[in-house]
Structures are given as structure tokens and as C-alpha cells.
Amino acid sequence: MKNVMIVLFMLVNFAYNPGPLPAQAVKEIGRFGIALDEASFPQNSPENLRKSLLKAINSDKIEYMLAHLADPSFIDKNVREVHEGNFAKQVAETREKLKKGLKSPLESLLKEGKLNASEKSASLKDPALKDFIISMKLENNKWYMENNKK
């Protein structure tokens, strides 16, 4: 209901004042209707992104992880081209992959992986998980998990 009220406010505001959207309204609506929560899921450093990813997985906040912690351009393209614009299908697919065996190595890598970071990119690696790497990138002053499959 809160999101509906914000959208209505923005429409009325735009009709009478066609300028940029208020930053607070954009922040509350968020991506795919998922509000940004920088206090609970900080991503201002690779280490904080690591902790936020682990927290999102452990608390089953897959929607949040995909909307805000994963590479936005990859998620947008995947939702549009693979899931016919349906974000819920992307979330369901990711949940299914986690259930089918991805969750355990992902958690292990997020907890135990060695972080190698540069100014604009980072990666988590663990020799015990040979080919399993988490890549990260800095974009618009936020760190995101990148898709390794290009």
C-alpha cells in the first residue's frame, strides 16, 4: 500500500511540477518495487558487499539480493530477455538454483573466501572451491556482485 501511495504522489507531483522525481520517492520504490535498504545491506566496499550477500542469502532476501546487490545491467537484461519482464520468475529461478546445491558453496565462499580487491573490482576465491569465484564491480559508488557467465 505504501508503494501505491508513493506512486500516486509522484504522478500528482509530476502533473503539477514536471521536474525530476524526489530522491526519497525513488529510494523508497527501489528496483522492481524492492526498497533500497543501505543500512541493513551496505555495499560501499567489497567486504560490506560480501556481508550483505551472505545476510541476504541467510535471511532468504533473494528479491533484495537480485534487485540491489547483483549487477543491475545483468539482472535487467536477464529479466527482460529470459523471463519476459517478470522479476518474480528471476527470483524463483535463483531460489531454485540455491535449493539445488548452489547455496552451500556460495555461503562457504562468502564466509571463507579470500578477498582480492582493486579500486574498481574485487573477487572472492577459495582453493577448496576450485572454479567457484564471486566477482564484484564498483559502479556509481556501490559494489555489485557480477555475473561470471558471459
Positions of predicted regions on the chain:
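Sec-dependent N-terminal signal peptides
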Residues: 4-12
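Short, low-complexity N-terminal intrinsically disordered segments enriched in polar/charged residues
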Residues: 18-59
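Short beta-strand edge/turn micro-motifs at domain boundaries
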Residues: 21-28, 130-150
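Surface-exposed, charged secondary-structure patches
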Residues: 41-42, 74-133, 149-150
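Stable alpha-helical elements in mature extracytoplasmic
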Residues: 45-53, 61, 65, 83, ...
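Hydrophobic beta-strand residues in large extracellular and virion-surface proteins
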Residues: 53, 57, 65, 115, ...
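Short, well-ordered alpha-helical segments enriched in acidic and aromatic residues
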Residues: 61-76
